[in-house]
Amino acid sequence: MFPKINTIDPYISLRLFEVKPKYVGYSSVDARNQSFAIHDIKDYEKFSNAGLFYTSPTEITCYCCGMKFCNWLYEKHPLQVHGFWSRNCGFMRATLGIIGLKKMIDSYNDYYNNEVFVKHKNRVYTHKKLEDMGFSKPFMQFILANAFIPPYRKYIHKIILNDRYFTFKFAAHLLSFHKVNLDNQTTYCMTCGIEPIKKDENFCNACKTLNYKHYKTLNFSVKL
């Protein structure tokens, strides 16, 4: 879960001020709960208790400071993340107090830095592996944009270990459910990501021949 715009303030202001929520309609926890409940989202209470309400499938917003967060659905610690990025939010100050907010930020800081570092390192390493395997740049960008979202994470771990079988399995599994026009005009081969193919096909002629036996071993149906 990350803010759409990085406005992090390294200091916690000690000044007193009257809190004026930017979205008054979501000041109550019931209103925030309802914003999630109507979209059939599970375990939404942790988000509404953190002062956040549902905006879209890719975005939630703090009713008080107005900060918008993306990549939120699988976040386990929304209160800590909210406080980490919006340290002078009136809701966070009222909920935890200045001392409590500072302690929470200090305890979360190590976890956050380690988590971000590991993900960044894996993305860089994975990008290099995909490049070495001959995947096209737009294809790699598409893979990395979805790679760390469950249930695809297990395939990325195999890519990091340079297992070409699982790289192909991941790419084909992902694209078989999401028919993608990578440049909005051309559809590329699901296997190599390089050769353009017709709209009603999934693989180029070379990959159809080379990978026929390979795709027969997979656990899902792929049109050859």
From Swiss-Prot:
Organism domain of life: Viruses
Official protein name in the record: IAP-like protein p27
Any one Pfam family match given in the protein's UniProt record, by short name: BIR
InterPro entries according to UniProt: ASFV_p27_C, BIR_rpt
Alphabetical list of CDD domains matching this protein: BIR
Record flagged with keyword Zinc: yes
UniProt keyword Zinc present: yes
Each BIR repeat, start to end: 29-92
One GO molecular-function entry: metal ion binding
Residues at which Zn(2+) binds: 62, 65, 82, 89
